[in-house]
UniProtKB/Swiss-Prot annotation:
Enzyme Commission number(s) of this protein: 5.4.2.2
Cofactor note: Binds 1 Mg(2+) ion per subunit.
Protein name in the entry: Probable phosphoglucomutase, cytoplasmic 2
Origin: domain of life: Eukaryota
Cofactor(s), names only, from the UniProt record: Mg(2+)
Region listing for Disordered, in residue ranges: 1-20
Active site: S124 (phosphoserine intermediate)
NCBIfam families to which the protein is assigned, alphabetical: PRK07564.1-1 (NF005737)
Keywords: Carbohydrate metabolism, Cytoplasm, Glucose metabolism, Isomerase, Magnesium, Metal-binding, Phosphoprotein
Binding residues annotated for Mg(2+), in chain numbering: S124, D301, D303, D305
One Gene Ontology molecular-function label: magnesium ion binding
Primary localization: cytoplasm
Subunit structure: Monomer.
Length: 585
């Protein structure tokens, strides 16, 4: 058995190491600076209680982006020096963020060990490569991201750090070969176990979904399927789940070989960046893939926690997706057969889920943006299904959003709706059919998001200030609105969203400005990133339509009057100098 020594390395604080819920994300060249990664890792160890470090088991893996392998070798050496008993690493450093959450919660080592936390190496949907982004975040023993109480401690520690211990003579660990490597250190034995990236996650998915019914759907000649991993870590699971377990043809997988630079692309599953899938599904305005599009398509981001769902020539909004999953979960997904504990969405997400909750008599929660708020509700047994408009959907099986889970949920719903079709020769119920039937039952929430990026920070704050000031006089607001578009409904209430967590009582203020209309429509304004590169203003526009004869309109056409009201009420062009947004979703 190879032995190692521990040495103390002197260091000094490095500015700008403040982690968010999504951890610390910077350019690779920043992480490669002397002591940059080491300082942050040690600051994290110092923020944890002793029993979470000494003698503990930690998971260290990520989405496989550039610099991951070097980072893992450094973290392993520091874990050994800090008295960690064992480190679990996904083969070739690959573990999706949802899989890490599942492994913390579910995996038991051969010696009975359970993980107390994880370092996840990802910058999510940000590009990867030598000149692009790297990231690191810490997840706790519940499988969820570190709460602010921990991330605040980490940040404080980065401002005072003077030294860190490291086992510099620990040999490089071969993370490409499955097995356990044991070492002997000053505090005793230290193991590094490299294991199959997919086994634990696949086992969990098979306990949630009826794989046989999905397999039957995928084998049906008229049902075609396409999945695009955008060269992210989802590729490590896609072949195993969709091809080996469910019998889909290999040709149904796009970009499913994980690459450290994501093939030079932007691993963000939306209509802009998942170009190849969008073209194949018949939704591209410029690129025709040729042939008949598949019936179902889906994409993932770099670390596989986000998802985009598509039908043939049909886009499912994330807001509709979570509502449809919640409405069909009990009948279509065995895990939910005894009922849902509750549902939740982030505040900017459309109110489609609210209508489902009201109709089905479910507990409903509206939370600020950030998955940790869902995690609190789930830990307390109050929420089963949740989602956000930024392509994140999940359930209480783990404490992260889960892209492949969302795909399997949709395939389960399709299999459930097509039971009779698969047994006979009836017409296939499509993704579009399911969405339109949902709208016919619950009404449609027309929805769009306008992003104004790199706006002057002062001007952005002034715009938000105007919107807060207007809220003090709703008669004046309604007078302005009638002058812009008389047919738009009156504003019933307006506020700045504030959330009191029903679990721990914590209060989150200034989470966005809301204008709520009498007909269920909403305008939401949020400000983010007031840094040196300016601010981003996000404008969310939503209109509720119950009239079945009006639910088939083009979204931008239906929202036209409300968009006009939002832009003129906020004086968007006057404050920003922009005649159009940077991005429309």
């Amino acid at each position: 058995m190879v032995s190692f020594k521990v040495s103390l390395v002197s260091t000094s604080p490095i500015d700008g190491q403040k982690p968010g819920t999504s951890g610390l994300r910077k350019k690779v060249k920043v992480f490669k600076q002397p002591n940059y990664l080491e300082n942050f890792v040690q600051a994290t160890f110092n923020a944890l209680t002793t029993e979470k470090v000494k003698g503990a088991t930690l998971v260290v893996s990520g989405d496989g982006r550039y610099y991951s392998e070097q980072a893992i070798q450094i973290i392993v050496k520091m874990a050994a020096a800090n008295g960690v008993r064992r480190v679990w690493v996904g083969q070739n450093s690959l573990l999706s963020t949802p899989a890490v959450s599942a492994i913390i919660r579910e995996r038991v080592g051969a010696d009975g060990s359970k993980a107390t936390g994880a370092f996840i190496l990802t910058a999510s949907h940000n590009p990867g490569g030598p000149t692009e982004d790297f990231g690191i975040k810490y997840n706790m023993e519940n499988g969820g991201p570190a709460p602010e109480s921990i991330t605040d401690k980490i940040y404080e520690n980065t401002k005072t750090i003077k030294e860190y211990p490291i086992a510099e003579d620990l040999p490089r660990v071969d993370i490409s070969t499955i097995g356990i490597t044991s070492f002997e250190g000053p505090e005793g034995k230290f193991d590094v176990e490299v294991f199959d990236s997919a086994d634990d996650y696949v086992k969990l998915m098979k306990s949630i979904f009826d794989f046989e019914s999905i397999k039957k759907l995928l084998s049906y000649p008229k049902f075609t399927f396409c999945y695009d991993a955008l060269h992210g870590v989802a590729g490590a699971y896609a072949h195993r789940i969709f091809v080996e377990e469910l019998g889909a043809p290999e040709s149904s997988l796009l970009n499913c070989v994980p690459k450290e630079d994501f093939g030079g692309g932007h691993p963000d599953p939306n209509l802009t960046y998942a170009k190849e899938l969008v073209a194949r599904m018949g939704l591209s305005k410029t690129d025709d893939a040729g042939g008949e599009p598949p019936e179902f398509g889906a994409a993932a981001d770099g670390d596989a926690d986000r998802n985009m769902i598509l039908g043939k020539r049909f886009f499912v909004t994330p807001s509709d997706s979570v509502a449809i999953i919640a409405a069909n979960a009990v009948g279509a997904i065995p895990y939910f057969s005894s009922g849902l504990k509750g549902v939740a969405r982030s505040m900017p997400t459309s109110a489609a889920l609210d209508v489902v909750a009201k109709n089905l008599g479910l507990k409903f929660f509206e939370v600020p943006t950030g998955w940790k708020f869902f995690g609190n509700l789930m830990d307390a047994g109050m929420c089963s299904v949740c989602g956000e408009e930024s392509f994140g959907t999940g359930s209480d099986h783990i404490r992260e959003k889960d892209g492949i889970w969302a795909v399997l949920a949709w395939l389960s719903i399709l299999a459930h709706k097509n039971k009779e079709t698969l047994d006979g020769n009836a017409k296939l119920v499509t993704v579009e059919d399911i969405v339109r039937q949902h709208w016919a039952t619950y009404g449609r929430h027309y929805y769009t998001r306008y992003d104004y990026e790199n706006v002057d920070a002062t001007a952005a704050k002034e715009l938000m200030g105007l919107l807060v000031k207007l809220q003090s006089s709703l008669p004046e607001v309604n007078k302005i609105i009638k002058g812009i578009h008389p047919e738009v409904a009156n504003v019933a209430s307006a506020d700045e969203f504030e959330y009191k967590d029903p679990v721990d009582g914590s209060v989150s203020k200034h989470q966005g400005i809301r204008y709520l209309f009498e007909d269920g429509s909403r305008l939401v304004f949020r400000l983010s990133g007031t840094g040196s590169e300016g601010a981003t203003i996000r404008l969310y526009i939503e209109q509720y339509e119950k009239d079945a004869s009006k639910i088939g309109r083009d979204s931008q056409d239906a929202l036209g009057p409300l968009v006009d009201v939002a832009l003129k009420l906020s004086k968007m062009q006057e404050f920003t100098g922009r005649s159009s947004p940077t991005v429309i979703t």
